[in-house]
């Protein structure tokens, strides 16, 4: 009996250690090879929430929304948000119905949609075509659809949204000021804000409550993606302002790993990092 009680206590303690979320984009190659084994590794690393980035042809990582939801439940992982880069005004209703069926709360537009996103391979820079006014109109329409589907719409930033465009407009500021918060809020990627030389806390103060999910990843001395806690971003000060920001969830993410580090190892380092920093 004493042994059983001890073991139960150990299991309970271990379960209590699970916290935080992981953006599955971090382990996208592993998910493509073996989703179940990869998700088990995510759970074993200590995460309890996930953000998907693998929707195609009505399925998440090759599974129906119901099957994906069931797999996550069996692994004690909670679906929180899903990145849907291929969303259009025509396919949004079906995508959102699938996201809802899979158990997600937030539908995230990760880049300017509908062909507006640009990437310059030569100098590795991102941007957008069209106008920010057009982007705002699209996001407003998507926000209305999300509300009807029982979801909340978020827009995820990179660095270019924090830089003035050819008309002198800072795109992220325009979206924050011109799209109804009942229809659109934001997923702040703390790495890309830092890369753009913007100040997350200044944005929290200017637009309180608008940043519902954070992407948490660090920056090494070369400016590259790094596991949380191993780089130069001052997460402690940012975390002190989480209530002001409106943050409900956060997702560890690392777009690429370097110097032989594998993504499934990087997520373990990052989980230790968020623990040391004080994320819960």
Show the residue positions of the predicted features:
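Active-site acidic/histidine proton-transfer and metal-coordination neighborhood
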Residues: 49, 89-185, 264
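A short helix->loop->beta-strand "cap" motif at the edges of active sites that frequently abuts
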Residues: 77, 104-105, 151, 244-248
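Histidine-acidic metal/acid-base catalytic patches
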Residues: 16-26, 30-45, 172, 176-188, ...
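N-terminal pre-domain/capping segments
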Residues: 11-106, 112-113, 272-275, 279-280
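The substrate-binding groove and active-site-proximal loops of carbohydrate-active enzymes
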Residues: 81-86, 125-132, 191, 226-229
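Conserved beta-strand positions in the central sheet of alpha/beta enzyme cores
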Residues: 51, 81-83, 108, 154, ...
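Bacterial N-terminal signal peptides
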Residues: 1-10
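Active-site-proximal loop/turn and secondary-structure-junction residues that shape catalytic pockets
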Residues: 26-28, 54-56, 85-88, 113-115, ...
């Amino acid at each position: 009996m004493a042994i059983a009680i001890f073991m139960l206590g150990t299991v309970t303690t271990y379960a209590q250690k699970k916290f935080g979320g992981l953006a599955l984009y971090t382990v996208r190659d592993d998910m493509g090879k073996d989703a179940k084994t990869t998700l088990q590794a995510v759970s074993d690393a200590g995460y309890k929430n996930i953000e998907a980035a693998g929707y195609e042809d009505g399925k998440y990582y090759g599974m129906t929304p119901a099957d994906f939801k069931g797999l996550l439940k069996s692994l004690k992982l909670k679906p929180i948000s899903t990145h849907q880069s291929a969303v259009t005004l025509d396919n949004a209703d079906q995508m959102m119905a699938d996201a809802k069926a899979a158990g997600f709360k937030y539908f995230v537009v990760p880049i300017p949609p509908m062909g507006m996103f640009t990437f310059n391979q030569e100098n590795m820079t991102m941007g957008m075509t069209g106008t920010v006014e057009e982007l705002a109109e699209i996001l407003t329409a998507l926000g209305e659809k999300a509300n009807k589907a029982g979801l909340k719409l978020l827009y995820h930033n990179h660095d270019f949204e924090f830089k003035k465009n050819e008309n002198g407009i800072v795109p992220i500021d325009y979206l924050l000021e011109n799209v109804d918060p009942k229809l659109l809020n934001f997923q702040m990627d703390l790495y890309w804000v830092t890369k753009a030389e913007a100040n997350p806390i200044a944005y929290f103060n200017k637009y309180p409550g608008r940043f519902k999910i954070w992407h948490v990843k660090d920056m090494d001395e070369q400016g590259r993606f790094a596991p949380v806690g191993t780089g130069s971003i001052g997460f402690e000060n940012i975390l002190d302002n989480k209530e002001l920001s409106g943050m409900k969830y956060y997702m560890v993410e690392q777009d690429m790993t370097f110097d032989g580090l594998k993504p499934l190892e990087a997520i373990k380092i990052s989980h230790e990092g968020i623990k040391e920093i004080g994320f819960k």
